[in-house]
Amino acid sequence: MDLLFASTNPGKLKELRRLVAGLPIRVVSPDELPRALPEVEEDGATFQANAEKKASTYARLAGMAALADDSGLAVDALGGAPGVRSARWSDEEPGPAPASPVCDLAEAAAAELGPVAGRGARDERNNDKLLRSLAGLPDERRGAQYEAVLAVARADGSLVASVAGVCRGRIGHARRGTGGFGYDPLFVPDGQGGRTMAELSAEEKDAISHRGDAFRRIRSLLERLAREGA
């Protein structure tokens, strides 16, 4: 079964393709479609609302079954922020924010290499903002969790199901690791010896991540849809 992944985020796409390995499913990215699909505005108040909207809209527009992800970081000390605004959190700064050397390098790469590097530059701005927001707080007040919702829709746009996954941890005091994307260099998941998500192997991350958790909850449904031809 061909399954459209309703996201242009290369990090999420890479993770999903690892997770579906072994299933009779070929994950298709929007970039592989014969015609470009319009952006779907993520204007929901919850991860579930956004994931379901994206799955239904992309499936209907493309005429094929679609899986959508909406996910982000919820920090206890920030009242659950950045939440659904995780990807674009730094865009909400009232003015130019002070940038770290890491952020400066990412901005230079974005200017030279284009959209994919630009996404990395935004990640670095988000991480800078997170560090500033928690400056001075001890570990016991830096609790956080990654949250993800996966939603599946049939080719006619009808929603089949949505499931949630969570990975609990805390926010570190400095970036560590080169893997993953987003807030991974700062997120220290529980039970991993103090390593950040970015210091884990791909297999280790998939075993404990919020997206992996959600996928395991929806895997049997995807297998059934594949048998039915969705």
UniProtKB/Swiss-Prot annotation:
Molecular function GO labels: dITP diphosphatase activity; ITP diphosphatase activity; metal ion binding; nucleotide binding; ribonucleoside triphosphate phosphatase activity; XTP diphosphatase activity
Keyword terms: Hydrolase, Magnesium, Metal-binding, Nucleotide metabolism, Nucleotide-binding
EC number per UniProt: 3.6.1.66
SUPFAM superfamilies the UniProt entry points to: ITPase-like
Listed cofactors: Mg(2+)
Cofactor note: Binds 1 Mg(2+) ion per subunit.
GO CC field: cytosol
UniProt binding sites for Mg(2+): 41, 70
Pfam family, any one: Ham1p_like
Alphabetical list of CDD domains matching this protein: HAM1
Annotated protein name in UniProt: dITP/XTP pyrophosphatase
Organism per entry: Anaeromyxobacter sp. (strain Fw109-5)
